[in-house]
């Protein structure tokens, strides 16, 4: 199921909604209201309702949203019917954490390969994911129909790795280095800079600290 021109931020929130809904479902609830979802994610109920209207879903005024139904709908929108395969490039602490944390979290996303240059990591298996030498990247990506790459290498190596991923046929990249990347328009790029995020938190923490003195 594909909805044209769905805003990037809405897609991001849909993923968060599904995670929240799965948690609520585990508590044996069958329905939920927008204000309950909003409270869990620290956003407004209006935002929740707007996002769900964009995907054509509305709840019952008395009972709220059917949790299982909404989880299934979000899955049809976000997930690929055939599933997608993911590779991590850079098997340091962050790369290993990705593999370990992600294991079994989503049935439609499979972490199936890792790449590194460290001989102590190559030809080993980490949490079920085999690690290959970086020189094997084009071959393994194409052979296993991998469409998503996660970059967790030292920042100076990121542009070269991104280029190799693009040339190998990758369609989406998650860049976890502070180095901005340039990729073709047909490759979706998501960049996450932990330093920037921490500085943002520090700014607002300082602001709150000053406000309540």
Where do the PLM segments sit?
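Phosphate-bearing ligand-interacting subdomains
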Residues: 17, 22-25, 129-213
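Glycine-rich Rossmann-fold phosphate-binding loop(s) that bind the pyrophosphate
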Residues: 91-92
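N-terminal Rossmann-fold NAD(P) dinucleotide-binding loop
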Residues: 95
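NAD(P)-binding Rossmann-fold cofactor-contacting core
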Residues: 106-127
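HTH-adjacent hinge/linker in prokaryotic transcriptional regulators
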Residues: 31, 35, 40-85
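Extreme N-terminal segment that seeds HTH/winged-HTH DNA-binding domains in transcriptional regulators
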Residues: 1-30
């Amino acid at each position: 199921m594909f909805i044209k021109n769905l805003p990037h931020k809405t897609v991001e929130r849909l993923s968060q909604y599904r995670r929240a809904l799965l948690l609520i479902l585990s508590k044996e609830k069958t329905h939920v209201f927008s204000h309950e979802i909003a409270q869990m994610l620290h956003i407004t109920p209006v935002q929740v309702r707007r996002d769900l209207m964009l995907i054509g879903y509305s709840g019952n005024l008395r009972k709220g949203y059917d949790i299982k139904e909404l989880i299934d709908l979000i899955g049809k929108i976000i997930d690929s019917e055939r599933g997608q395969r993911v590779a991590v490039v850079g098997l340091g602490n962050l790369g290993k954490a990705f593999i370990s944390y992600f294991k079994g979290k989503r049935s439609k996303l499979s972490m199936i390969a890792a790449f590194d240059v460290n001989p102590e990591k190559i030809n080993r298996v980490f949490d079920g994911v085999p690690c290959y030498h970086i020189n094997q990247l084009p071959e393994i990506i194409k052979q296993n129909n991998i469409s998503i790459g996660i970059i967790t290498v030292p920042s100076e190596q990121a542009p070269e790795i991104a280029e190799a991923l693009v040339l190998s046929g990758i369609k989406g990249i998650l860049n976890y280095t502070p180095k901005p990347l340039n990729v073709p328009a047909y490759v979706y790029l998501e960049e996450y800079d932990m330093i920037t995020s921490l500085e943002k938190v520090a700014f607002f923490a300082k602001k709150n600290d000053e406000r309540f003195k």
